[in-house]
From Swiss-Prot:
Keywords: Alkaloid metabolism, Decarboxylase, Lyase, Pyridoxal phosphate, S-nitrosylation
Any one GO CC term of the record: cytoplasm
Biotechnology: Loline alkaloids show broad-spectrum anti-insect activity, and different lolines may have different biological activities. In vitro tests of NFL, NAL, NML, and semisynthetic loline derivatives with long carbon-chain acylations on the 1-amine have shown that many are effective against both fall armyworm larvae and European corn borer larvae, but the effects seem to differ depending on the modifications. N-Formylloline reduces the weight gain of fall armyworms by deterring feeding, and does not significantly affect corn borers.
Catalytic residue positions: 351 (proton donor)
Residues annotated as site: Stacks against the aromatic ring of pyridoxal phosphate and stabilizes reaction intermediates: 190
N6-(pyridoxal phosphate)lysine PTM sites in chain numbering: 62
Name used for this protein in its record: Amino acid decarboxylase lolD1
Binding locations of pyridoxal 5'-phosphate: 194, 231, 266-269, 381
Signals that turn on the gene: Expression is induced in loline alkaloid-producing cultures as well as in planta.
EC number(s) given by UniProt: 4.1.1.-
Subunit structure: Homodimer.
Length: 420
């Protein structure tokens, strides 16, 4: 962790706590807050362009609506994968052009198609006959992208059960595009959500996308866009990139050689997760005379939870463990192997008994009310998942560390040439 991140946390805690006095504690001084190191985004962009230089990242906006994150990616040269009109409007409100957006949701309300037509969002995904006919009726000039089924069957949360055309349906859908005199811009797939580790799922997706291209050419269509989806994380990206490069070279050899292939991807977590750290405050401490089952006797209750920034604990059973404790403005690292630790459990602020962040956490035994716990990798699917359950709201105040190398990473976004 960069020293500047640690200092940002310490300084903010000292500031908010300096405003309190006995009997007069401001609610704002107890609100959880983020520190975001925007330099991390620039480093990730450079790593992406080194590993997959011919693939343009279209950031999956659903993972984070943070405007500074989005603006930094836009400056680097990213496009944007939007799954709703609201996400499209967010991107456009930041002065980012419509040509940098792909509407990736395969099943959309009719009203959104009319708005996309009005706003100039041309690249739109479908995966079934009903959706294609809906597009034909409401937005016939759209540049359609056929999403095919490509999933990792070992994944705990497979997406293929919800979206993606089966191989048996590809031929009929391609022929229907031709029959309706519409444009098939290309093919896409989404191998798995961000817990994916099976790079072979991406290879299967690329091969199925190549089948879409082949069948399209047989009926006189000329697709040029390959969208290899999302699911990339720090731990899986290099493995996936190493499998994707040769698969594209093998399956799309002539298009690559002739410069007739535009390749997109939809990374979300890869860019949004690690730049953000979250500090939450301990609001209560309880020690039971007898442990409940195998749980530790000590329980800590925090001012956040699964209905706020820890929703991924509920969705995919993700484990969260603090990397530091801040006490009276001083940072205490919790990752050092030599430090003394005590078992405890971390509980969220709601009245739901399932609102537990970690049932077996090892922390400084002195942690108590008023201390802050710092968590890393908190940028993806956190603020976007906040609810108002129990009446709680989240301020989600964020302190930004400005990027210093963005000019070196900056590239001019190359507009997709989608004319068929």
């Amino acid at each position: 962790m960069a020293t500047v991140v640690r200092e940002a946390f310490e300084n903010h805690v000292k500031l908010v706590e300096s405003r309190n006095s006995p009997g007069h504690v401001l609610a704002s001084s107890e609100a959880s807050f983020f520190v975001a190191d925007l330099n991390d985004i620039v480093r990730k962009w450079a790593a992406w362009k080194k590993a997959l230089p011919d693939v343009t990242p279209f950031f999956a906006v659903k993972s984070s609506y943070d405007r500074r994150l989005i603006q930094t990616l836009a400056t680097c040269g990213a496009g944007f994968d939007c799954a709703s009109v609201e996400e499209i409007e967010l991107i456009l409100s930041l002065g980012i052009g419509a040509e940098r957006i792909v509407f990736t949701h395969p099943c959309k309300p009719v009203s959104s198609l009319g708005l996309c037509r009005k706003l100039g969002i041309t690249l739109i995904t479908f995966d079934n006959e009903c959706e294609l006919r809906k597009l034909h009726h409401h937005y016939p000039e759209a540049q359609t992208v056929l999403r095919v089924f490509a999933d990792d069957p070992t994944n705990a949360d497979p997406l293929g059960t919800k979206f993606g055309a089966a191989r048996e349906d590809i031929d009929g859908l391609v022929r229907l595009v031709k029959e309706l005199n519409m444009k098939l811009a290309g093919a896409s797939f989404h191998a798995a959500p961000s817990v994916a580790v099976d790079a072979a799922a991406y290879v299967r997706g690329i091969r199925d996308a190549a089948e879409v291209f082949a069948r399209a050419r047989r009926v006189g269509l000329n697709p040029t866009v390959l969208d290899i989806g999302g699911g990339y994380t720090d731990s899986t990206f290099q493995q996936i990139a190493g499998a994707v490069r040769p698969a594209i070279a093998e399956c799309f050899k002539s298009q690559v050689v002739e410069g007739r292939l535009r390749i997109l991807a939809e990374p979300g977590t890869l860019f949004s997760c690690s730049p953000f750290y979250l500090a939450v405050k301990v609001v209560a401490r309880r020690r039971n005379a007898a442990a409940f089952g195998n749980e530790p006797a000590t329980r800590l209750y925090i001012n956040d939870g699964i209905y706020s920034n820890f929703m991924m604990r509920f969705i995919v059973n993700m484990t969260f463990s603090p990397v530091a404790v801040i006490r009276k403005g001083v940072w205490y690292d919790q990752t050092e192997q030599t430090m003394r630790r005590e078992a405890c459990s971390l509980w969220g602020r709601s009245c739901d008994s399932n609102d537990c962040i970690n049932r077996d956490c090892r922390l400084d035994p002195e942690v108590g009310v008023g201390d802050w716990l710092v968590f890393k990798d908190m940028g993806a699917y956190t603020t976007v998942c906040n609810t108002t359950f129990n009446g709680f709201t989240s301020s989600n105040h964020t302190i930004y560390i400005e990027p210093t190398q963005v000019d070196k990473a900056q590239s001019t976004f190359e507009q997709l040439e989608l004319a068929i």
